[in-house]
Amino acid sequence: MPQNEYIEQHIKQHGRRLDHEERKRKREAREAHKISERAQKLTGWKGKQFAKKRYSEKVAMRKKIKAHEQSKVKGGSKPLDESGDALPTYLLDREQTNTAKAISSSIKQKRLEKADKFSVPLPKVRGISEEEMFKVVKTGKSKTKSWKRMITKHTFVGEGFTRRPVKMERIIRPSALRQKKANVTHPELGVTVFLPILSVKKNPQSPMYTQLGVLTKGTIIEVNVSELGMVTSGGKVVWGKYAQITNEPDRDGCVNAVLLV
């Protein structure tokens, strides 16, 4: 073994500390706080260099995410006749242009327009002011900073939701006010079912509230209706369907909605 690998040799012979994994996990969890602290405290040339390094890291990450998203859509094969070679017989009927992106974008557009096709039970709702929606949270050692806000209404955050680091989290969605399921009533069948919420489609108050997943009266939500056994005209099982919230969830403590059929 090379002389400079004495640490690896010691690990192989004696193993690691019993709390090594826990210490490693905590060190990685503290990393975001350390980066935040350095970004706030470093000034002058060091601050500029640190900001430049962080910027390049973020750009690289965005490029990596974009490349990963594009790799999911298979690219069209380049025509072989440009190089002068003849196309084989089994490739003559293949399309050279890639239509996957066009199809996926048209499907997304149709999904966006779906909510507008229905005549909703509540066409008009009462407007909610920002003072009613958000509560100012005082932070800092002497509680003088007031840039944080806490949502006072019920919200939906989804399955894989992870909170941002505390120092960077501007809007807080309390765990006690998060909803995962709704009491959905089918208007034609006259039955009420307790169904899981898939997403918040549109909040009539503001696009920002839609993005935050705020559940207020008149909000269009997508629910999982696979339990109802609904099928399309083509015989396929319907997975998600839109519903409109008809009550005030923050007053009742639950979400009641009417299915849009």
Swiss-Prot record:
Keyword vocabulary terms for this entry: Nucleus, Ribonucleoprotein, Ribosome biogenesis, rRNA processing
Ribonucleoprotein is among the record's keywords: yes
Subcellular location: Nucleus, Nucleolus
GO biological process, one term: maturation of LSU-rRNA from tricistronic rRNA transcript (SSU-rRNA, 5.8S rRNA, LSU-rRNA)
Protein origin, superkingdom: Eukaryota
Intervals of motif Nuclear localization signal 2: 51-58
Motif (Nuclear localization signal 1) on chain: 15-22
Cited Pfam families: Ribosomal_S8e
Keyword rRNA processing (UniProt): yes
InterPro entries, alphabetized: NSA2_fam, Ribosomal_Se8/biogenesis_NSA2
GO cellular component: nucleolus; preribosome, large subunit precursor
Compositionally biased tracts (Basic and acidic residues): 7-35
Broad class of where this protein is predominantly found: nucleus
Positions of the UniProt region annotated as Disordered: 1-35, 61-84
Family affiliation: Belongs to the eukaryotic ribosomal protein eS8 family. Ribosome biogenesis protein NSA2 subfamily.
Function noted in UniProt: Involved in the biogenesis of the 60S ribosomal subunit. May play a part in the quality control of pre-60S particles.
Assembly, per entry: Component of the pre-66S ribosomal particle. Interacts with NOP7 and RRP1. Interacts with RSA4 (via WD repeats).
Protein name: Ribosome biogenesis protein NSA2
